[in-house]
Every structure is written in C-alpha cells, then in structure tokens.
Amino acid sequence: MLRLGRAIAALLAMWAVATDAFAAPIIIVAVGASNTSGWGVADGSAYPERLQVMLRAKGVDAQVINAGRPFDTTGGMLGRIDQSVPNGTRIAILQPGGNDLRFLGSREQRSANIAAMASRLRARNILVIVFDPEIPRQYYAWDGIHLTTEGHAWIAASLLPQVLATLRAGAKPR
C-alpha cells in the first residue's frame, strides 16, 4: 500500500510539472499608435518588448504583444480593438498617444474613445491599464513626437509596477 501511495504521489508530481511546463504565458497586449509600435527605434527597443523582458526578469511568464499602429487615432484603435486584443488576453495596455489632437480631433472624442475601448475590453473580462502620462520632454526624438530608446525604457519602467499590481489585484495567480 505504501508503494502505491508513493507511485500515485510521483505521478501527481510529474503531472503538475508537465502541466506547468505547457501552461500558456500571460498575454498582455499594448494598443497604441507609432510610439507603441516603436517608430524610430531599433527592433526590440519599443516599450512592449522591453516590458516583456522586465516581467520575465521578475518571474512573470508573460508575452507582450505589440499592437501599435503608426498614425492611428483613438477612433482607429476603437475600430480595431476586438481584432487587436485576442480572446485569452489578461491585460490590455491602452497608450492612446496624441494623434487625435494632431489630426484635429477633440479632447472629448478622444476621452470617449478611450472609455469605449476600456468598456469593451472589460466586458470581455480583460484587465485594462490606460497609460496616458505626460512624458518628460527629454525622452522625445528630434521631431518632438516620437520617443527615443530612453523614452521607451522610461515607459516600460513606469508600466512595470502597474502591470504587476494589476496582475495581483485582478487575476488568478499562476
């Protein structure tokens, strides 16, 4: 009987290790415009990629999908939000940028679009972080619109504690 118990315990331990090894990573999708996409910086330097590296360094098995699209506005983001953020996503990061105002949109419409995106995502049980801070000027490139490599690092470092807190507060631990 003791052998049977040990055999069952060993099988359960192997099963637990096997299922954990095949567990899918936490999916996080970064939605935005050119700064999210990494316009003007080297591959792997955009904040979504940097955030993924930082999360993994903290022991979080996360895949951060970059759904940034240059020249996009919040209206465009709203129009593609369901396609850009697949089912199974745990967190969506909305980084709306300034194209609405640059392309003569109103602040009110921009705010309404951000609220509508967040509402649609939450209705799908996706946690939402709206990241729309005043980014320090030293992190902008010569054009005053796009971020430098250091600007992307700043965003990733700023988002990291928010993502970790969101995972702790609203998600089942893995």
Please give the residue ranges for each predicted region.
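Flexible, glycine-rich phosphate/dinucleotide-binding loops
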Residues: 37, 73, 137
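Alpha-helical cap/lid subdomain in secreted, periplasmic
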Residues: 50-60, 76-174
